[in-house]
Regions:
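Structural signature of hydrophobic alpha-helical transmembrane segments
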Residues: 1-10, 79-90, 132-145, 204-219, ...
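Alpha-helical transmembrane segments of multipass membrane proteins
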Residues: 15-20, 46, 95-99, 121-125, ...
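C-terminal ends of transmembrane helices
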Residues: 16-27, 94-106, 148-158, 220-235, ...
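Alpha-helical multi-pass transmembrane bundles of energy-transducing inner-membrane proteins
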Residues: 24-29, 114-118, 122-205, 290-303, ...
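Predominantly late transmembrane helices and immediately cytosolic-facing juxtamembrane segments
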Residues: 224, 338-342, 408-441
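Juxtamembrane/interfacial segments at transmembrane-helix boundaries in multi-pass membrane proteins
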Residues: 52-74, 173-232, 257-275, 323, ...
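Central hydrophobic cores of alpha-helical transmembrane segments in multi-pass inner-membrane proteins
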Residues: 5-21, 35-48, 89-101, 119-121, ...
């Protein structure tokens, strides 16, 4: 078994094994098996870093075996600098989420942790797939465990939220399936994504392909105006579900733009870049303003995610090295920061059972250790230098200035909104006098919560202070992508 197969199937097999346990039996054993499975999945990604060769844009760790031979469908995996970091990020967040749900989940424990481990493997599969059908299978299969996580362990309106999540993302993907089949026919019967990158395609077909992929990926990111499912889903999802959704699942859509939309339809991508930039700026500015008026902490952070992902798509479609690399760095940083923000909300919700900002105030007086972590993650969400939230956004702004000064100015101005809604929430929840009896009786974080938040704090600070390892791996692949996109496919 190759290294990528090991990274994909280790958590999936542990997840399937967990499903064999009884509904609420052996909960203690289940938790330990889940943690061992998550750690094994993370350890399986370590050799990838050691063996990754810098300076080459070629796919590495390639595995290829026949799957459905009649239609030339292959189990074809590979990693390059663009996709590399999302594999260990997914495995890392899975470990954190297992720790987060350790004491909180008391019903259907084996199914809960099993669903998360299976979801982890499927998401890694999306980032590794080099066959169109294999990508589609992994991409769509991620909906099933997340649908169950929201629908079973979510809030009072969980069924509505689960259906909305499932239908929005599934309907968007149907057009992508049509595009994949068209490319299969056009290429003479191949689902090889890398072969599709070299396929000559006329202008009209490129435009249709671009918008077919846009339908699938824009909903997943989500971009404005197809973002409306995200706040509803975050509000109802359990804490672990929100953390994984924000930290990893939103990245599947953004990754799709780099693997499909831009290299397969480069002329259409350049032609419609202005539209993508406008939609991205609307997400950053307008959705940032919407976040400022939210009274529900989860909704505020959900809208914050839409705004931060707007920086990602903005970076991609300004078509320069700083923009694309900055977008990728922002994706990784957002994985750490947004996951941490949702887990902090979960810590409070487990104690007070309210997500309303008005229910809190003065939390720093009763939970000083927790408030210190919350302050760090809030500063990272604002884009404070020396935190992970700063690096990607700064690179995107520099890339935007390089492309057009006024575009860069608009992007930089939008950072003000991020600071405004984050600091407004922090002030009302953590500072000031103790608001009510619920807050007055709060206990500070326990050892499990301290470990969970410490892991994320280390990641946020390390990436903010020393981002070079992250950018070093992606630079060559980003340069190759931009070189490819700059060449017209029109005859």
């Amino acid at each position: 078994m190759g290294l990528l197969s090991l990274a994909i199937w280790t958590p999936i097999l542990f997840g399937v094994a967990l499903l064999a346990f009884g509904r609420d039996e052996n909960a203690k054993v289940v938790r330990w098996v889940a943690l061992i499975g998550a750690l094994a999945g993370l350890l399986a990604t370590v050799p990838l870093y050691d063996a990754f060769q810098l300076g080459t844009p070629a796919m590495q760790f390639v595995e290829k075996a026949p799957w459905i031979e009649r239609f030339n469908v292959y189990y074809h995996l590979g990693l390059d600098g663009i996709s590399f970091w999302f594999v260990p990020l997914t495995a890392f967040i899975t470990v954190v989420v297992v720790i987060a749900g350790w004491e909180v989940i008391t019903e259907r424990v084996s199914q809960y942790f099993g669903a998360f481990l299976i979801l982890s493997g499927l998401m890694i599969g999306v980032f590794c797939a080099l066959d169109g059908i294999l990508f589609y299978v992994f991409f769509e299969a991620t909906l099933i465990p997340m649908y169950l996580i929201i629908g079973i362990w979510g809030g009072p309106n969980r069924i509505y939220a689960a259906f909305k999540f499932f239908l929005y993302t599934l309907l968007g993907s149907l057009l992508m399936l049509v595009a994949l089949i068209w490319l299969y026919v056009k290429s003479g019967g191949s689902f090889d994504i890398l072969a599709w990158h070299k396929l000559p395609i006329d202008g009209t077909a490129q435009t249709l392909l671009f918008f077919a992929f846009f339908a699938a990926f824009a909903v997943k990111v989500p971009m404005w105006p197809v973002h409306t499912w995200l706040p509803d889903v975050h509000v109802e999802a359990p804490t672990g579900g929100s953390a994984v959704l924000a930290a990893i699942m939103l990245k599947l859509g953004a990754y799709g733009f780099l693997r499909f939309s831009m290299p397969i339809a480069p002329d259409a991508a350049r032609e419609w870049a202005d539209l993508m930039i406008v939609l991205s700026l609307v997400a950053v500015i307008y959705v940032g303003l919407v976040a400022m008026v939210q009274q529900d902490m989860k909704k505020l952070v959900a809208y914050s995610s839409v705004a931060h992902m707007g920086f990602v798509t903005l970076g991609f479609f300004i078509f320069n090295d700083l923009g694309v690399a900055g977008g990728l760095v922002q994706m990784i940083a957002h994985g750490f920061v947004s996951g941490a923000m949702f887990l902090c909300i979960g810590v409070l919700y487990d104690r007070v059972h309210s997500r309303e900002i008005a229910s809190y105030g003065g939390v720093i007086n009763t939970m000083p250790k927790f408030a210190a972590f919350a302050l760090l993650f809030a500063m990272a969400n604002c884009g404070l230098p020396a935190t992970a939230g700063f690096v990607g956004e700064w690179m995107v702004i520099l890339g935007a200035v390089k492309a057009n000064f006024w575009l860069g100015l608009a992007a930089a101005t939008a950072l003000i909104f991020g600071a405004a809604y984050t600091l407004w929430m922090f002030k009302r929840v953590y500072l000031g006098p103790v608001a009510n009896d619920d807050v007055r009786t709060l206990t500070d974080i326990n050892a499990r919560e301290f470990l969970m938040l410490t892991l994320l704090a280390i990641a946020v600070l390390y990436m903010g202070i020393f981002p070079f390892p992250f950018t070093q791996i992606m630079d060559t692949s980003v340069a190759e992508l931009l070189k490819h996109v700059a060449v017209s496919k029109l005859n």
